[in-house]
UniProtKB/Swiss-Prot annotation:
One Pfam family it belongs to: NAPRTase
Name of the molecule in the record: Nicotinate phosphoribosyltransferase
Keyword line: Ligase, Phosphoprotein, Pyridine nucleotide biosynthesis
Keyword match Plastid: no
SUPFAM superfamilies: Nicotinate/Quinolinate PRTase C-terminal domain-like (SSF51690), Nicotinate/Quinolinate PRTase N-terminal domain-like (SSF54675)
EC top class named in words: ligase
Pathway: Cofactor biosynthesis; NAD(+) biosynthesis; nicotinate D-ribonucleotide from nicotinate: step 1/1
Protein role: Catalyzes the synthesis of beta-nicotinate D-ribonucleotide from nicotinate and 5-phospho-D-ribose 1-phosphate at the expense of ATP.
Entry EC no(s): 6.3.4.21
InterPro entries linked to this entry: N/Namide_PRibTrfase (IPR041525), NAPRTase_N (IPR040727), Nic_PRibTrfase (IPR006406), Nic_PRibTrfase-Fam (IPR007229), Nicotinate_pribotase-like_C (IPR036068)
Protein's gene: pncB
Similarity comment: family membership: Belongs to the NAPRTase family.
Length: 434
């Protein structure tokens, strides 16, 4: 892969449009896995997605030019899968399985285009919504977030000269490499890049992936970014996300259907996927509620991804549940991925070493950590907590509770209804940084 002088590239914006999204597969792998399931099992469901900036002190509409945002969103809508990308998706093995994507699905995907968007401003924030068929709107989540985050980075660096940019990226590279060196202390580490959605930029994410590949070798197990996996000859990694149980719950007509929504999604998932893709994401409506009501067959799945509780605390609860269900945790897998940086990775690894199989998904603090790297403080280079979540399904409001109330999304009245239904056990407020 050709090396890019990122500082020079950032400074030299002589072209009309520097695309942030270069390909429809510049997205997370689990979006494609989920898309196939949605296409196959939920083809007629409509779902809306909404951009949510949880870092309220940052007014995105004041930092990002609306014209530039529209240009990037419009450009993303022009993209189609290339012949090379189609061949790679059809011919490659993922998670040890050939032809994980059905030919009929790929034929449909070959003509895929991102649907239209709605953009406005309110109270210094952008209101960005995507309405339509779930099998279309779901694919906006990652590119929308990547566009917003990179435009914010570009805006913060607009006034910087070439020398300052050179210093900025030199320091960021040194900071990143020092993290890589610390990870070498963990002999059985398995870690992958989960940093697409809130990355500083595509080029910076690519450099971070190359650094991990070079620095920790086989301990680096792949990237969630499908384009980077293809271009760098890496494994594409990822399982499933909260949107699946959120939509199933929104569609529920009875209390029984609402209670069973997370498990219905797992059954649906297992119709298409197996093995190391059988990873449970338990916290959409609170991990305690999920474990309390879970059928015994859930304990036979490969592992869990505790996503909003503190990693050690969340991992211990799942290990206790496995033991209660008569399963040996040493044969199970925990994937930690919530807001991790190198200290948390090391602490979590050492805490659970020998007790359970572990893997780590390293996200924003891998691909967007520029704190202290600029010669003067530039607040626009600090990452923010911005997400793009399902807001409704077939016109019915969607809710995510999470183990951290700060991460809850949905209409307040609906959130309250879900809390009364699923309970508030083990939900603990934690500051959300990314």
């Amino acid at each position: 892969m050709a090396k890019t002088d990122i500082a020079r590239r950032v400074y030299n914006h002589a072209w009309k449009l520097d695309p942030i999204i270069r390909s429809l597969i510049d997205t997370d792998f689990y979006k494609l896995l989920m898309l196939q399931m949605i296409w196959k099992l939920y083809p007629d469901v409509n779902a809306s997605f909404t951009l949510i900036n949880r870092t309220k002190r940052v007014h995105l509409a004041e930092e990002i030019d609306e014209g530039e945002l529209r240009e990037q969103l419009d450009h993303a809508r022009t993209l189609r899968l290339s012949k090379k990308e189609m061949i790679w998706l059809a011919g490659n093995s993922f998670y040890g399985r050939a032809q994980i994507f059905e030919p009929e699905f790929l034929a449909w995907l070959s003509n895929f285009q991102l649907p239209e968007y709605e953009l406005s401003k309110k109270d210094g924030q952008y209101v960005l919504d995507f309405h339509g068929a779930w099998k279309e709107t779901t694919m906006w989540e990652i590119p929308a977030l990547a566009i917003v985050n990179e435009l914010r980075s570009r805006s913060a660096m607009k006034a910087l000269g070439p020398f300052t940019l050179d210093v900025l990226y030199a320091r960021a590279k040194a900071k990143m490499w020092s993290k890589v060196e610390r990870l070498r202390e963990l002999p059985g580490l398995r870690i992958s890049d989960f940093g697409t959605r809130r990355r500083h930029s595509f080029l910076w994410q690519r450099w971070c992936v190359e650094a991990l590949k070079e620095g920790i070798g086989p301990a680096f197990t792949g990237t969630s970014n499908v384009l980077l996996a293809m271009d760098s000859d890496l494994e594409a990694v990822g399982t499933n996300a909260h949107e699946l149980p959120m939509v199933a719950a929104a569609l529920a007509q009875t209390d029984e259907q609402l209670r069973n929504a997370p498990y219905k999604i797992l059954r649906d998932w297992n119709k298409l996927y197996g093995g190391n893709l059988l990873i449970v994401l338990p916290d959409a409506f609170g991990t305690a509620a999920f474990l309390r009501d879970a059928p015994e067959w859930v304990a036979d799945w490969t592992g869990f991804r505790p996503d909003s509780a503190p990693p050690i605390e969340g991992g211990e609860k799942i290990i206790d549940w496995w033991k209660k269900m008569g399963r040996d945790p040493r044969q199970k897998l925990l994937i930690f991925s919530d807001g991790l940086d190198v200290d948390a990775i090391i602490d979590t690894y050492r805490h659970f070493e020998g007790r359970v199989r572990m893997s780590f998904g390293w996200g924003t603090n891998l691909t967007n950590d520029f704190a202290g790297c600029a010669p003067t403080e530039i607040s626009g280079l600090n990452p923010i907590s911005v997400v793009c979540k399902v807001s409704d399904a077939n016109g019915r409001p969607a809710v995510k509770l999470s183990d951290n109330p700060q991460k809850a999304t949905g209409e307040p009245a609906e959130v309250e209804r879900y809390l009364k239904f699923f309970g508030t056990e083990d939900r603990v407020d934690q500051t959300v940084l990314v």
